[in-house]
Regions:
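Conserved PLP-enzyme active-site core in the AAT-like
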Residues: 1-152
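Non-catalytic terminal extensions of PLP-dependent enzymes
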Residues: 128-361
């Protein structure tokens, strides 16, 4: 089960174990995009490693990509095994069996710096240090979201607009860093466009700083008259020395770590406010995106930044790209299985395969 997503949705692990635990010997949680949930107290129910489990519960495996938002070199990852509560039962997987299964797929010439990075990461988080690092980081990112909500009108963070009868940005930062109400997907809420989930099932990962740009009426699922494609904002930020993690049709993502300082985040906010001012002033594209303008001057000669946004937005709108993208992930639009993936893998290993162009697949 994928515990957390790239874009910042995270499961309630306790709820998963309560719902399906009795059906499983073990549950494997893929926590590649998280791994720090046990160091943020309000996220304790999202951490499979912090659950109190008994002999009737499943064993737990958790894998984490330490290199993403923790202190690890590229490719550094780790696997955790939590199953002392079922030791002695037939389903229990001993430590040596796990190690031998792992070694069957591991290199005998590993890069030892990766192991050193794991040790450094563990030491950094030892005792109360890990909690202090991450809770302070959460507060920093909360303040950044508040600044955007108060100062921007085209760009907003993906958070509930109102919590407990008060605007999100009017909440007390100390409380918000310790209360999952400010990060919850409540059933029936319309601000995010998701459907088909239960109370307490999903939360926003506070360390995935995602901004939504104008252009899509999320509550009604339709396009607005004007919009700012995420790619335009991403290129503007790169022009100004800020590298986003990724962008999509109408959003942009930053992965936050304890290394983020108030100074760095204030710089991001200032750049976003400046971008909106350039949109309102309909500044020349050559001023806002000089590198792209220079590379394609024949195409964009005389363009303004608002004109570019409108042209790209209309392209998406006329083709209903937002709906097409959403359909990619719906069951009714998935391709029909001709053969199951395991059987296909065996046939591939036997050489019974052919490389074809994507349009023929």
């Amino acid at each position: 089960i994928q515990l957390g997503t790239y874009d910042g949705c995270i499961y309630n692990a306790r709820q998963i174990v309560e719902k399906i635990g009795h059906l499983c010997d073990y549950i494997y949680f893929d926590s590649a995009w998280v791994g720090y949930e046990q160091f943020i107290p309000m996220m304790k129910d999202c951490s499979p490693l912090l659950l109190e489990l008994g002999p009737e519960d499943p064993g737990i495996f958790v894998t984490q990509s330490v290199h993403k938002q923790q202190a690890g070199f590229s490719m550094t990852s780790q696997a955790h095994k939590k199953d002392s509560h079922i030791k002695g039962q037939d389903r229990y997987v001993p430590h040596k069996r796990v190690n031998n299964a792992f070694m069957m797929h591991a290199s005998t010439s590993p890069l030892y710096q990766l192991f050193a990075a794991l040790d450094v990461n563990a030491k950094m988080h030892e005792g109360e240090a890990g909690k202090k690092l991450w809770v302070e980081a959460v507060k920093t990112v909360i303040e950044t979201r508040k600044q955007i909500l108060r100062n921007c009108h085209y760009i907003r963070p993906l958070v509930p607009p109102v919590v407990n009868g008060k605007k999100w940005e009017d909440g007390d930062t100390e409380k918000m860093a310790n209360d999952m109400d400010y990060w919850a997907f409540e059933p029936g809420a319309k601000w995010h466009g998701f459907e088909g989930y239960g109370k307490g099932q999903y939360f926003i990962d506070p360390m995935k700083l995602q901004f939504v740009t104008c252009g899509i009426d999320i509550e009604n699922g339709g396009y607005e008259e004007f919009g700012i494609p995420g790619n335009i904002l991403a290129n503007y930020l790169r022009e100004n020395g800020i590298i986003p993690e990724k962008c999509d049709l109408n959003d942009i993502l930053f992965l936050m770590t304890p290394a983020e300082s108030k100074t760095k985040m204030d710089d991001l906010v200032a750049k976003l406010i400046r971008f909106e001012k350039l949109i309102d002033e309909d500044a020349p594209m050559a001023e806002v995106l000089p590198s792209i303008y220079k590379a394609y001057e024949d195409k964009y000669k005389g363009y303004t930044i608002r004109q570019l946004c409108q042209e790209m937005h209309d392209f998406y709108k006329d083709r209903k790209v937002f709906t097409l993208q959403k359909n990619l992930f719906l069951h009714d639009y998935l391709p029909e299985y001709v053969i199951n993936p395991q059987e296909a893998q065996y046939e591939f290993m036997r050489g019974h395969g052919e490389l074809v162009d994507l349009e023929q697949a």
